[in-house]
Amino acid sequence: MSSDLGKKVREIREAEGLGRQAFCDLINVPKQTLINVETGRSSPSGKLLAEVSKCFSKYTLWLMTDQADESCGQISPEIEKARQTLKQTGTDTD
């Protein structure tokens, strides 16, 4: 489970287009802690998960349950990446 959460944290960071240091600055954790979590060397702490959820609240449901509900603003990194691709190609519907 912890490696799954670490992978999810990494997916969120990448979907937001952030490098590790920028992400760490936002969630107030040391870079080495993030590296250890993302690579599965350590489990994410409750504090880290809370900070990720606070800073990137649109991913909270997905982070904890593997589900997304766009109707209430809860998405997955996959949805965010698709949105970014649509914006870049000019095919978004907004």
Where are each of the predicted segments found?
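Short alpha-helical DNA-recognition segment
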Residues: 17-36
